[in-house]
């Protein structure tokens, strides 16, 4: 697996199509998310938060196919937590230059998730983030716990499209998490190189 950081403006048309198609496959087709996709974007998933303020982490396999993605947005710019899920926070959604939102995080294979997660945190921290916020479902919350990710809940669990979700906040610095080392099954040299 090879990981790269991209800005929307720097992506060529082919890469944009690949990412939009991958997100649609993962979120709409696989997970069944009901998203407002315009007719001219059928088969592709984008939203109003895909702007020049977003940074994208993309994971590729040896055939240059996308197998994972994540989106980072500073909370000083429009973001999903503030614009759609503010009711998931007990108080006002975080809004600070050092707090970034991570959304549209997904991988084709489960074993790719934590390498991409750590790489996303590293990208955010190098860009000036101290903390990451986002929405997770109960499955992802359990996955974070299993993998030693320390986080705090920003509010109570709420129902959204027949799913339990909650807003969380976590450190953008890998050393603050108990699972800072990859599980032994995932410690190939290639993965360690990408996530160091």
UniProtKB/Swiss-Prot annotation:
Designated name of the protein: Acyl-homoserine-lactone synthase
Species whose genome carries this gene: Pseudomonas fluorescens
Xref: InterPro entries: Acyl_CoA_acyltransferase (IPR016181), Autoind_synth_CS (IPR018311), Autoind_synthase (IPR001690)
Catalytic reactions of this protein: a fatty acyl-[ACP] + S-adenosyl-L-methionine = an N-acyl-L-homoserine lactone + S-methyl-5'-thioadenosine + holo-[ACP] + H(+)
Molecular function terms, GO-annotated: N-acyl homoserine lactone synthase activity
BP term (GO), one: signal transduction
Disulfide-bond pairs as recorded: none
Function: Required for the synthesis of a yet unknown N-aceyl-homoserine lactone (N-aceyl-HSL), an autoinducer molecule which binds to PhzR and thus regulates phenazine production.
Enzyme Commission no: 2.3.1.184
Keywords, ordered alphabetically: Antibiotic biosynthesis, Autoinducer synthesis, Quorum sensing, S-adenosyl-L-methionine, Transferase
Family affiliation: Belongs to the autoinducer synthase family.
Top-tier EC class: transferase
């Amino acid at each position: 697996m090879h990981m790269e950081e991209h800005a929307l403006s720097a992506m060529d048309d082919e890469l944009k199509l690949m990412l939009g198609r991958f997100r649609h496959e993962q979120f709409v087709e696989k997970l069944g998310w009901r998203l407002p996709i315009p007719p001219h974007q059928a088969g592709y998933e984008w939203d109003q938060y895909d702007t020049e303020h977003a940074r994208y982490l993309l994971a590729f396999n040896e055939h240059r196919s996308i197998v994972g993605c994540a989106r980072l947005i500073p909370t000083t710019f429009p973001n999903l937590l503030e614009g759609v899920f503010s009711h998931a926070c007990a108080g006002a959604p975080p809004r600070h230059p050092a707090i970034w939102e991570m959304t549209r995080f997904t991988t084709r294979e489960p074993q790719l998730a934590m390498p991409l997660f750590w790489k996303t945190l590293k990208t955010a921290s190098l860009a000036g983030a101290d903390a990451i916020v986002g929405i997770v479902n109960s499955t992802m919350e359990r996955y974070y716990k299993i993998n030693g990710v320390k986080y705090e809940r920003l509010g109570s669990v709420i129902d959204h499209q027949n799913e339990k979700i909650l807003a969380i906040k976590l450190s953008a610095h890998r050393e603050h998490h108990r699972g800072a080392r990859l599980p032994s099954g995932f410690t190939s040299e290639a993965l360690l190189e990408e996530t160091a």
